Regions:
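Non-heme di-metal
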Residues: 1-168
């Protein structure tokens, strides 16, 4: 895959990846209000996960701005996914988290393949690309960080999301 193809894939996937944490956090929040009981800190954690996925998206948007057709595809996908995931979460939160865990496993594989291609010299534009100030600040990267370092940080986030969702 080329840099442009990876960017399209990452942008599309990250627009969907932010949904589960937000839906799960909202449903758990409403349940906590309804039952008048603590949630054990999961609401905050799930909302942070959604925010982290949004940061991933914003990171990739620094390199490419999608066109109207792509944005419409995202809108349609989000409408379907929000509805479907909400229903699944209400029916079985355990199944919903397991599903997200598997999606995160696929994300880890995708980022791993991208990093491998970058290391093999198949993505020459990204090999010389510096990390942006925003990514350096967000992930605490060194000032001389490259795009590869950003991809490693994003992959590490996805690994954490995978583990948390398999735990839940």
């Amino acid at each position: 895959m080329s840099e442009a193809q990876y960017l399209k894939r990452f942008i599309f996937l990250e627009t969907v990846a932010g949904v589960p944490g937000m839906i799960a956090g909202m449903i758990r929040h409403l349940r906590s209000l309804r039952t008048m009981q603590q949630d054990g800190g999961w609401i905050h954690h799930l909302l942070e996960e959604a925010e982290n996925e949004r940061v991933h998206l914003l990171t990739f948007l620094q390199l490419r701005q999608p066109g109207l057709l792509f944005r419409l595809a995202i809108l349609g996908t989000q409408c379907i996914f929000v509805t479907g995931f909400s229903a699944l979460y209400l029916l079985s939160s355990k199944t919903a988290h397991r599903f997200v865990g598997y999606l995160e496993e696929e994300a880890v594989k995708t980022y791993t393949n991208c990093i491998k291609e970058l290391d093999e010299g198949n993505l020459p534009e990204w090999a010389k690309l510096d990390a942006t100030k925003e990514t350096i600040r967000y992930w605490g990267l060194p000032e001389n960080a490259k795009w590869r370092d950003v991809l490693l940080a994003i992959r590490a986030d996805e690994v954490m999301h995978r583990e948390v969702n398999h735990h839940l």
